[in-house]
Design a protein with these regions (language model features):
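Bacterial N-terminal signal peptides that target proteins for export
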Residues: 1-9
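Aromatic-residue-lined binding/catalytic grooves and analogous aromatic/hydrophobic interfacial grooves
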Residues: 21-26, 168-186, 197-252
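Membrane-proximal, proline-rich intrinsically disordered regions
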Residues: 21-84, 88-91, 95, 99, ...
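Conserved, well-structured interaction surfaces
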Residues: 70-189
Length: 252
């Protein structure tokens, strides 16, 4: 009797095993219709702009001077800011901007990316914002890993570039962006200028002037050259109407 039960049990188990090995086409049952299959450059740009908008509005200085006070988390009020670092910029907006540039330059992805604006204009805006972030970072932390950065496991310890080299990289970044700007469609997802490339050109030139002023004591000759290049073009922000603004929500 026991042997019979064992044989029946083995037969049932074997049947289940062989049945489970059948190749069954379940169609799109396991495909998420809401899951994106590729990064969308317009969304990457919006997220990068949202993150960058807080760079110039850090509250630490107000807390240092006790114009405001903290309760539950009094770190800044106690000057406990030694742990501040640039990791969130590398893994946040800069990573998004790098991806925008990559998608608009890749032979297999640029056609799809162009649905969200002219390829070169998207690259130009990404480079301008990237230079803006980079200036903030080097002014705060000095030397930064840049030329060897973003290589992942191929180079987990990239070298640090000097602040002097970083500024030269930023000037090149802005000038490359200015050369790319054209009359084509501006980028979708641009919540700052709404894809208006003329305003991005004004901002890029004004950023170049700001960078020149920042190095005027360290390298007066270079600062003078870069500043005068913009002045001679006459193409820079000269009124509040062209200011770079990030609007949170609506005005209602």
């Amino acid at each position: 009797m026991n042997n019979t039960l064992k044989k029946i049990s083995l037969f049932i188990c074997a049947s289940l095993i062989f049945t489970s090995c059948d190749s069954v086409d379940f169609g799109d049952t396991n495909e998420n219709p809401n899951g994106p299959t590729a990064a969308v450059t317009s969304q990457l740009l919006t997220q990068a702009q949202k993150t960058v908008s807080s760079i110039g509005t850090n509250l630490s200085g107000i807390l240092f001077t006790q114009q405001l006070a903290e309760g539950q988390y009094p770190g800044e009020s106690r000057y406990a800011v030694l742990t501040y670092n640039y990791n969130s910029y590398f893994t946040g907006p800069i990573q998004n901007l790098n991806e925008i540039i990559k998608l608009n330059q890749g032979a297999e992805t640029m056609a799809q990316a162009e649905a969200f604006g002219n390829n070169n204009n998207q690259i130009a805006v990404a480079k301008i914002i990237r230079a803006y972030i980079l200036q903030f970072m080097t002014d705060r932390w000095g030397a930064l890993p840049w030329t060897e950065a973003f290589q992942g496991i191929d180079n987990p310890q990239p070298k640090f570039d000097s602040q002097q080299d970083i500024y030269m990289i930023m000037f090149a970044e802005v000038e490359e962006a200015l050369a790319l700007i054209n009359s084509g469609a501006g980028p979708s997802g641009d919540v700052i200028f709404g894809g208006d490339m003329a305003k991005w050109e004004l901002f890029a030139n004004s950023l170049k002037m700001t960078m020149a002023l920042r190095i005027s004591d360290a390298d007066p000759a270079l600062a003078k050259t870069k500043f005068e290049q913009v002045i001679s073009s006459g193409n820079f922000i000269s009124s509040n109407a062209d200011n770079i603004l990030f609007n949170y929500g609506s005005d209602d």
